[in-house]
Amino acid sequence: MVDVQYKNVSEFPGWSKMPQFIHDFIQRNGIKTVIEIGAGANPTLPIDTINKLGISYAINDFDVHELSKSSDAYIKTVFDPCSSNFYHANTYDLVFSRMALEHVSNAKTFHKNIFGILNPGGYAVHCFSTLYALPFVLNKFLPGPISNILLDIFNPRDRSRHEKFRAYYDWARGPNHILIGKFEALGYKVVNFTGYFGHPYYKKIPLLNKLEEIKSAWLVRHPISYLTSYGSIILQKVR
């Protein structure tokens, strides 16, 4: 039985809550070896936390330049988990990603490759944005220059540390039985699948933001999977 939940975006672990979320997950499950996919310039756990946990913690990106922005104290691995001829020698108790899954161009290949680098009983944990929340529909279908302008208006950030990458949203949806079946067909057990309603992109427009908050509160009580804005999923390798 899959644990499916729906929550408000304020509980989404994919941003500032992620370090504590992953820290607690590692401790709770006796994790010893970890790799963060798509960490690039912004690894989730700081080096001192990694040392206190006593774990091996590698960070990954397919872009050498992005990895070069992070401290050399990290174990760095360059590979593309979407590659059809993927090979990576090491295996891990935990593979996780933060706001990277929406940028995966071929989700089936990605999740198959991640499955291959998990130890038996190991976990894959992902936090990601989903369709069909309006901001992400626009992000997917608008030309890059226009979506860049909108991002700078509604959610400005330091591009040297948080670059904007193309989003595909392949398998990036809220909880639904079709998607759960796809993960199970690859050999995963879906431990938990949570959808989150709401987003921060209307904060500069108070009335619109208030309406979004009202809508999100209603959707938590009456969930519609395809209207989630974000998702988190915990998968386990069981075969």
Feature locations, PLM:
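Short, solvent-exposed loop/turn segments at secondary-structure junctions
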Residues: 40-44, 63-65, 101, 130-133, ...
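S-adenosyl-L-methionine-dependent methyltransferase catalytic module, highlighting the catalytic core
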Residues: 108-109, 113, 123-236
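A short SAM/SAH-binding and catalytic strip from SAM-dependent methyltransferases
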Residues: 94-105
